[in-house]
Amino acid sequence: RVAGGEVHRILADAGIGQDEPHVFADPKLYAEWSFVEELDGVLAATDAVPVAVGSGVINDLTKLCSHHNGRRYMVVGTAASMDGYTAYGASITKDGNKQTFDCPAPLGMVLDPSISAAAPARMSASGYADLIAKIPAGADWMLSDAVGSEPMDDFAFGLVQDGLKEALSDPAGVHAGNVEKVEQLAEGLLLSGFAMQATQSSRPASGAEHQFSHLWDMEHLKYNGASVSHGFKVGIGTLASTAFLEMLLDAPVEQLD
């Protein structure tokens, strides 16, 4: 419900008619197919333009269901928790497996840094982990380009990489909810989404570290009985990926056959 009331007020003040907001009742809301079916039913009963108010799960559910119902949507982000706000595709668990479904990015996106800074620290930590993963992901892309596998896109690469140092400069400030630092984090995440949108590929924003997350998705990884956020899984993958890159740099590759 964070920011939902304010969005309702702003639209009402602008004279825009609104349906009754749909709020998922399940406190353990997850990007899972049963919730897709629930929201599909809601949207099928109206011709209203969907406005997602929330973070990753709400955005992915609304993105896919809007596509199912033949319309575009906008999103009001409430946390700097992941890079998918501005990218195509929705990650949804169906038949026990996490899958990426093809669907367009939102037509519009709004994020108030003061609201995101007030989100639980674990959500910003998840976003920070997702963003720091862009460093080894960028290295992976450079290696892939060097061996002729996946050509670099200089525009998309720069969109992701150029602002990383500043966006990642103060993890303590992000954890403490410093508005300026959370805003920098959010900007980095949104730019990553734009890069994926520009290339219609996740290549600019993900590398080997994301494969760990995909594996754990398929294994239904939980911690203390709860699902683990995408960012945290990617963060652990980043540790493994960077360790491998360090080993690669130390390896006498010129001696390899």
Regions found by a protein language model. Name each.
Residues 43-65, 69-78:
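A short, small-residue-rich loop immediately preceding and capping a beta-strand
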